[in-house]
A protein has these predicted regions:
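Positively charged n-region of N-terminal signal peptides that target proteins for export
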Residues: 1-5
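Bacterial N-terminal signal peptides
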Residues: 6-14
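Sec/Tat signal peptide C-region and signal peptidase I cleavage site
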Residues: 16-21
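Short, functionally critical alpha-helical segments immediately adjacent to catalytic or ligand/cofactor-binding
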Residues: 22-36, 51, 71-72, 95-103
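A short, acidic/glycine-rich surface segment
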Residues: 36-39, 82
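Substrate-binding/active-site groove segments that recognize
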Residues: 41-59, 97-99
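Alpha-helical segment that forms one wall of the substrate-binding/catalytic cleft
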Residues: 57-108, 116-123
Length: 125
């Protein structure tokens, strides 16, 4: 196979998929704060995941590792409860709703629905 053909194939693959999918945690961080570890939300939310102060379990909210650990500590029980009550894992859309409005997971508001769709687009790219 010639170098030119290999280059053409690789270029085609790259152009056909210019963006790569993010995992859920990366997409959540991107949607919530643009990956800004120093972000503070209008309600005092902290970290790249915009966690409410009363839910923050400890650690440095400006440290990406601590923030991810805190987000997982908050979210994993929500995911477990969803799976128990719905008899299936949460979809990407439901994951985002569980993060922002767990009490409305079956009927999210229009604003949360719009953000959940953007979240899904980041995960599925």
């Amino acid at each position: 196979m010639s170098f030119r053909l290999i280059l053409l194939v690789l270029t085609g693959l790259w152009l056909g998929n210019p963006a790569f999918a993010m995992d859920r945690w990366d997409a959540l961080s991107m949607i919530e704060s643009g990956d800004n570890d120093h972000a503070v939300g209008p309600g005092g939310e902290v970290s790249r995941f915009q966690i409410r102060r009363e839910l923050w379990p400890g650690g440095n909210p400006q440290d990406a590792h601590d923030a991810l650990s805190a987000a997982k500590e908050i979210m994993l029980p929500r995911l477990d409860e969803f799976q128990r009550t719905h008899q299936r894992p949460a979809t990407d859309f439901e994951f985002y709703v569980l993060w922002n409005a767990p009490w409305r997971v079956d009927h999210p508001s229009d604003a949360v629905t719009k953000r959940a769709r953007r979240f899904c687009n980041l995960v599925r790219r």
